[in-house]
């Protein structure tokens, strides 16, 4: 069923946002690929799909969802998965990703990406759900580590141990969100480099970079600001460990002009290139 574990690096991408549609089509900026928010394109017809078709003609796209709720105790939402599959057949995505989390229970959506307990029981619950989703979609799914603000007393493993074991058992891939690692390390007091060291190199398909909000005692993953220096430094160490992984910039609020995001993407290229040169030296 599956191809080799991960695709070769696709370079450096941006999250596709509505305010930039026209400029992207008109100017064809130097972006290697775009990541789309899956849920924005699940309704047939309308402007979002019109613009996506035009942009897809010039750029590869990856699909990134927020509604799979793979960690929920509710049954998998097959209507949602069918809609995802229809969109995938239309756009031929590089890969399909979502989050290692739960978003609701008993049919109610909490509109947040909530962490799960890192236990053997949770692994046994998640693996068949991931396998079923992958079988239905016909591809490995790529699961992202979420930022977290609470933890469970029941947890038996670290987050990175859990993620590594889950990827192995379910034969899925990992979207490594470097900002989320930084946020969770700050909030819970663990070593971000230990997280990186615990993730299997062969499972990392993509890296996310984003900004956050520092509230003093804790920080929140808000995607509303540029990437800060400590996150760039963590990204450099991630590239040294995992190699030239496909990387992209997320911005979901206070979205700046496209030119500013292109400058930030150039910074990602520069950081990655320096990290690879240091690793090769």
What residue spans do the PLM features occupy?
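Conserved, mostly hydrophobic/aromatic
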Residues: 34, 96, 141, 177, ...
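Active-site acidic/histidine proton-transfer and metal-coordination neighborhood
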Residues: 77-174
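Boundary/entry segment of secreted carbohydrate-active catalytic domains
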Residues: 1-24
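Acidic (Asp/Glu)-rich catalytic clusters
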Residues: 23-29, 46-63, 79-94, 133-136, ...
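C-terminal helical cap(s) of enzyme catalytic domains, especially alpha/beta-barrels
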Residues: 258-280
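Acidic-and-aromatic substrate-binding clefts and catalytic sites of carbohydrate-active enzymes
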Residues: 22, 38-50, 69-78, 149-154, ...
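Gly/Pro-rich active-site loop or hairpin
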Residues: 45, 75, 113-117, 123, ...
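Distinct, well-ordered alpha-helical segments
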Residues: 21-25, 152-168, 184-197, 259-262
């Amino acid at each position: 069923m599956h191809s080799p574990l991960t695709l070769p690096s696709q370079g450096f991408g941006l999250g596709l946002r509505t305010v930039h549609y026209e400029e992207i089509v008109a100017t064809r900026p130097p972006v290697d690929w775009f990541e789309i928010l899956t849920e924005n394109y699940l309704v047939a017809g309308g402007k979002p799909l019109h613009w996506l078709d035009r942009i897809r003609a010039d750029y590869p796209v990856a699909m990134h969802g927020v509604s799979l709720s793979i960690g929920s105790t509710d049954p998998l939402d097959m209507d949602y998965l069918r809609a995802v599959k229809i969109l995938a057949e239309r756009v031929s995505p590089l890969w399909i990703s979502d989050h290692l989390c739960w978003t609701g229970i008993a049919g109610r959506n909490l509109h947040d990406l909530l962490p799960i307990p890192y236990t053997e029981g949770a692994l046994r619950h998640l693996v068949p759900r991931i396998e079923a989703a992958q079988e239905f979609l016909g591809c490995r799914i790529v699961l992202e580590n979420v930022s977290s603000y609470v933890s469970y007393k029941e947890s038996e493993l670290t987050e990175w141990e859990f993620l590594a074991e889950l990827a192995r058992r379910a034969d899925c891939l990992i979207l490594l969100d470097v900002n989320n690692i930084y946020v969770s390390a700050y909030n819970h007091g663990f070593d971000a480099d230990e997280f990186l060291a615990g993730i299997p190199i062969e499972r990392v398909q993509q890296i996310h970079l984003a900004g956050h909000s520092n509230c003093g005692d804790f920080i929140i993953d808000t995607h509303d600001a540029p990437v800060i220096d400590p996150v760039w430094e963590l990204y450099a160490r991630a590239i040294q460990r995992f190699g030239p992984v496909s990387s992209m910039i997320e911005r979901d609020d206070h979205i700046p002009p496209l030119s500013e995001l292109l400058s930030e993407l150039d910074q990602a290229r520069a950081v990655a290139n320096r990290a690879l040169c240091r690793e090769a030296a």
